[in-house]
A protein has these predicted regions:
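Proline-aspartate-enriched helix->loop->beta-strand connector
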Residues: 102-111, 127, 232, 236-241
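Basic- and aromatic-lined ligand-binding clefts that recognize polyanionic substrates
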Residues: 47-51, 55-59, 158-212, 222
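N-terminal export leaders
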Residues: 6-11
Length: 308
């Protein structure tokens, strides 16, 4: 009888130890880097909500779980998150729904550029990973986010594998791009046009992907430098890389293709040589190249165009 009681005590002790061990594992934190520096956040959190499309792209690439997404027109790359029965809306990128957050009780909130002003308020509901990508070395910041998210989800090796693949594809595109002459990033928006050069929000096109900028110095501005059709003929780049903002946000309006179909543009080298690339607007504008899926799709489009 004494032996049976002892065995029961031992088993009970083991059960308690396992329970405590599991609780400790669930409560464990991990140190990662985000836009603020080093932060301590939950390891393998049970409930994660996301206010950044680039972060959604990263999580999808890693095979991680998400429990709340912004009420936002999602690009084809993120179509899986349109099912509200699986991924309830938690407000917009600019205006989080705090009542929904209160009900979901997330263990981690991931937020970025468009939600930056709300991060202090969001942090009242759960720890926040800030994946904002600012000016400067954008690719390094994107790699930082991939490493942080993959570490939090407990799959750092997957994050490193994604980075290695991206590095290889960038090198291949850069080698092609440097043989193509000059290129100019052009955004169309409501019938108006603006261009972006090195140092702008689309700096990666030049400094990472290897497209050679035109000689004309372009004003660095959030909304780009407003230009005319005459400007396009004057600078006359070998390639025009066109981003249709109306298409990116799903707004009705004259398409970029229609806007550029005129005599002045017809006289440019880019038109004559069929060197106009209509970029994946959602990947460039909504996701800002900030996730592995968007990056790889954009690299493939450039590689295919430069390889013609």
């Amino acid at each position: 009888m004494q032996g049976l009681w002892t065995r029961r005590q031992t088993l009970a002790g083991l059960g308690l130890a396992l329970t405590l061990s599991w609780s400790a594992a669930q409560a464990a934190d991990v140190t990662v880097k985000d836009s603020r520096g080093e932060v301590s956040l939950p390891l393998q959190p049970k409930t994660v909500v996301v206010y950044d499309l680039g972060a959604l792209d990263i999580i999808q690439s890693l095979g991680g779980a998400v429990h709340g997404v912004p009420n936002q027109a999602l690009p084809p790359l993120l179509a899986a998150y349109k099912d509200q029965t699986k991924y309830p809306h938690i407000g917009s990128l600019f205006e989080p729904d705090y009542e929904k957050l209160k009900a979901l009780k997330p263990d981690l909130i991931i937020a970025g550029n468009r939600t930056l002003p709300k991060i202090a308020e969001l942090s009242k509901f759960a720890p926040v990973l800030d994946v904002t990508v600012g000016d400067g070395d954008q690719l390094t910041q994107i790699y930082r986010n991939i490493r942080a998210i993959s570490t939090i989800y407990g799959v750092p090796q997957k994050g490193e594998a994604e980075i290695k693949t991206i590095e290889s594809e960038i090198a291949a595109v850069k080698a092609k791009a440097q043989q193509q002459g000059s290129g100019l990033m052009l955004m169309t928006n409501g019938g108006k046009m603006s261009v972006y050069g090195p140092g702008s929000r689309f700096d990666m096109l030049y400094t990472v992907f290897g497209v050679q900028p035109v000689k004309d110095k372009i004003e660095v501005s959030k909304h780009g430098q407003a230009v005319s059709f005459e400007y396009l003929l004057k600078t006359n780049p070998d390639w025009l890389l066109v981003l249709d903002r109306d298409a990116a946000i799903g707004r009705e309006g004259a398409s970029a293709r229609k806007l550029l179909d005129n005599k002045l543009v017809h006289a440019t080298k880019a038109w004559r040589n069929q060197h106009i690339i209509y970029l994946n607007a959602a990947n460039w504008y909504l996701l800002s190249n900030a996730g592995p899926g968007a990056l790889r799709e954009n690299l493939k489009q450039l590689s295919d165009a430069f390889g013609r």
